C-alpha cells in the first residue's frame, strides 16, 4: 500500500513507480494505467503525468453508482475496476438474472469500466456459464465493459 509505506515507513513508492516508468520509456510511448483503491495515490499521478489513465479499484461489489458518487470518482479517476458481482450479482449458488446499471451509469459519465475476478476455478462460472470461460467473457463483454482483468490471460487472448 503506497500510502501506508509513505506515511509509516518513509518510502516513496509513487516516485519509484514514476521513475521506473520513465526509465523504461513507458511514460511516453505506451498507454499507462495506474490503478489504486486510494484516491490520493491517483491524484498524485494525475499531477505528475496527466496522460496516465487512472483507474479506481473497487475490491468489493457495488450495486449502484449515483451521480454524487460518480462526480467524486471523476475527480480522481478516468476508469474503474469493479468485481464481476458489481455487474451480475450472485446468490449463494447462481448469478441472478438481473444485471445492475453500474456500467451504464459509469459510461454516461464518460468513465471506463473494467471488470476483474475471472477465474476458471469458481463454482458460479461452471454452473452459470456451462463450465466455459468464453461464455463468461462474452456475457460480461455484452454488458458493455471496456475490458476484463483475468487470472487466465491465455484464455482471454485465445478469446480475442
Please give the residue ranges for each predicted region.
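Short active-site oxyanion
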Residues: 28-33, 144-147
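Hydrophobic, Leu/Ile/Phe/Ala-enriched alpha-helical segments that form helix-helix packing faces
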Residues: 20-24, 45, 106
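Active-site cleft segment of glycoside hydrolase catalytic domains centered on the general acid/base Glu
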Residues: 1-31
Amino acid at each position: 500500500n503506497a500510502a501506508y509505506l509513505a506515511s509509516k515507513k518513509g518510502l516513496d513508492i509513487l516516485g519509484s513507480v514514476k521513475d521506473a516508468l520513465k526509465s523504461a520509456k513507458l511514460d511516453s510511448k505506451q498507454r499507462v494505467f495506474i490503478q489504486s483503491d486510494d484516491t490520493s495515490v491517483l491524484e498524485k499521478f494525475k499531477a505528475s503525468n496527466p496522460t496516465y489513465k487512472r483507474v479506481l479499484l473497487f475490491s468489493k461489489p457495488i450495486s449502484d453508482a449515483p451521480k454524487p458518487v460518480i462526480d467524486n470518482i471523476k475527480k480522481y479517476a478516468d476508469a474503474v475496476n469493479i468485481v464481476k458481482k458489481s455487474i451480475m450479482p450472485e446468490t449463494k449458488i447462481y448469478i441472478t438474472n438481473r444485471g445492475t446499471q453500474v456500467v451504464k451509469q459509469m459510461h454516461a459519465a464518460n468513465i471506463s469500466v473494467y471488470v476483474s475476478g475471472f477465474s476458471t476455478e469458481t463454482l458460479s462460472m461452471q454452473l452459470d456459464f456451462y463450465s466455459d470461460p468464453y461464455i463468461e467473457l462474452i456475457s460480461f463483454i455484452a454488458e458493455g465493459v471496456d475490458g476484463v482483468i483475468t487470472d487466465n490471460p491465455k484464455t482471454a487472448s485465445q478469446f480475442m
